[in-house]
Amino acid sequence: MCGGAIISDFIWSKSESEPSQLGSVSSRKKRKPVSVSEERDGKRERKNLYRGIRQRPWGKWAAEIRDPSKGVRVWLGTFKTADEAARAYDVAAIKIRGRKAKLNFPNTQVEEEADTKPGGNQNELISENQVESLSEDLMALEDYMRFYQIPVADDQSATDIGNLWSYQDSN
């Protein structure tokens, strides 16, 4: 503190009636160091109700999971509701970690096995959800591009698409 003095020992508290008690060892309170575990009062509260998801500022829910074998985060997609995102996390967690995975819905695995019919394809259901999610994202992107007056190939003829500016034309 660059030549300054520490004066905290000379400022009296409300419990000390007179400044004359300053500096006396008996009047000082001995502080017990507080450990980090005592400050928390148990478990840390989650921001979200579910594991592996977060809410975007515009309201959609994003899901991702960390793949420990690759050391990277795996993007699972964006969803309308927190439940959908949490279920996507559960499916990925079971694929990555197997039976030891911590799930948002522990009974989901039993329900999924009961719902799967012999000959039914669960990949079709997942791909339909992905198509729906991607189409919503595409519509949002098109709205963004229209707002900034960026040309969008939207049911245009091939000549109109050819007239759009491209990187190759600028060189």
UniProtKB/Swiss-Prot annotation:
Modifications the protein undergoes after translation, according to the UniProt entry: In presence of oxygen, the N-terminal cysteine residue (Cys-2) of ERF71 can be oxidized by cysteine oxidases, thus preparing the protein for N-end rule pathway-mediated proteasomal degradation. Under low oxygen levels, Cys oxidation is prevented, ERF71 is stabilized and confers tolerance to hypoxia.
Q: Which SMART domains match?
A: AP2
Which gene is this protein's source?
ERF071
This protein's source sits in the domain of life called Eukaryota
Q: Mind naming one GO cellular-component term on file for this protein?
A: nucleus
- Specify where the region named Disordered lies, as residue ranges: 16-48
Q: Which GO terms describe its biological process?
A: cellular response to hypoxia; defense response; ethylene-activated signaling pathway; positive regulation of DNA-templated transcription; regulation of root development; response to anoxia; response to water deprivation
What protein name applies here? Ethylene-responsive transcription factor ERF071
**Keyword flag DNA-binding:** yes
Q: Which organism is it from?
A: Arabidopsis thaliana (Mouse-ear cress)
Family, similarity comment:
Belongs to the AP2/ERF transcription factor family. ERF subfamily.
**Compartments where found:** Nucleus
